[in-house]
């Protein structure tokens, strides 16, 4: 099942990744881990095919240093990364994605969050393979309450998945899983992955 553990600091842990990879489930690892911790867990068997490092608005030099460090210390290559910020529409964000795509053409890139087809278009044109969709619908997300910005999750999934298909990409539904059936609804709306955990 294409489920991805959320990159929240109490969910996207190395321990979670080790447990989930046994079932071929992916894990967006929290961005609060240091390089040496990554090396330690990769050497313990953390599979980089299922466990993706998360970045925010880091400079390309930080991403380059991380990928090079992991390869040098573990003999394993980072296969996918997740870019995660609350507002995926800002210019600086799309610029970082473009720089990363240019530097690492074979790397899988998932970026977000957005809730509109225009946001999907922006991030996919910048080089993302997948786009995280969801603002304000997460179990502990207070974006809608504090900023007034948000969008119903199912509606966002439907609209954004249609746009992603135009670029041969996919969306990751991020948020809105609260009751029985929400995961199924996300897949029915066209999501390639459903991110869960809060």
PLM segments and residue spans:
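Active-site entrance/lid segments in N-terminal catalytic domains of soluble metabolic enzymes
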Residues: 1-170, 198
């Amino acid at each position: 099942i294409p489920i991805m553990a959320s990159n929240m600091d109490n969910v996207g842990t190395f321990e979670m990744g080790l447990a989930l990879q046994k079932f071929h489930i992916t894990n967006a690892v929290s961005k609060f881990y240091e390089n040496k911790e990554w090396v330690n867990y990769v050497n313990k068997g953390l599979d980089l095919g299922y466990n993706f490092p998360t970045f925010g608005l880091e400079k390309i030099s930080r991403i380059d240093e991380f990928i090079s460090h992991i390869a040098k210390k573990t003999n394993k290559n980072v296969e996918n990364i997740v870019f995660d910020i609350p507002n995926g529409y800002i210019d600086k964000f799309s610029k970082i994605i473009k720089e990363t795509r240019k530097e690492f053409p074979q790397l899988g890139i998932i970026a977000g969050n957005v809730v509109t087809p225009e946001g999907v278009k922006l991030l996919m044109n910048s080089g993302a393979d997948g786009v995280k969709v969801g603002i304000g619908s997460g179990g502990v997300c207070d974006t809608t309450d504090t900023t007034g910005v948000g969008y119903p999750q199912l509606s966002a999934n439907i609209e954004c998945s249609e746009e992603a298909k135009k670029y041969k990409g996919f969306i990751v539904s991020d948020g809105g899983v609260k009751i029985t059936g929400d995961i199924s609804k996300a897949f029915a709306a066209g999501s390639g992955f459903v991110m869960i955990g809060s």
